[in-house]
């Protein structure tokens, strides 16, 4: 009988130790995420402009170019392709310009993913209200789903906390991946939007 009680006490001690370790681990993760969230929000708050090179992939088609972004809601991207394509947002409208074909397509910014991506306050609220959907050794990913069930995934470099790009679907339901390279924060942008 004594051996049986000793065995149960041993099991209880091990179980208690196990739950204590799990509790400490979860607490450390929450503290770590809180610091990460605070640092990411501070980085975004301090950012006024961004300039960067990009690689955009729509299904299997890749395009490259460079962009200038000025918060809130202003962006100008020049694609390095034969169509001489540009995307410009003036804060109200997004214009896709194809100089080679002399065509311009206009969209209200509110119906595009740019309304979230180019609005720093919306991104900060997304970070405050949501946990990342993924954190790996390189990236932190957040997901935003609007009222119409459109998804935008925004990602940041885990170490530098710099904006690294986004993923969404275009108006034809094609997967769009936009990756940022050679990012420069708070540089003087001389171009008018």
Report the location of each language-model feature.
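A short, Trp-centered hydrophobic/proline-enriched beta-strand micro-motif
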Residues: 42-62
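Sec-dependent signal peptide recognition
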Residues: 14-25
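N-terminal signal peptide c-region/cleavage motif recognized by signal peptidases
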Residues: 29-31
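Flexible, surface-exposed loop/linker segments and immediately adjacent secondary-structure boundaries
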Residues: 100-139
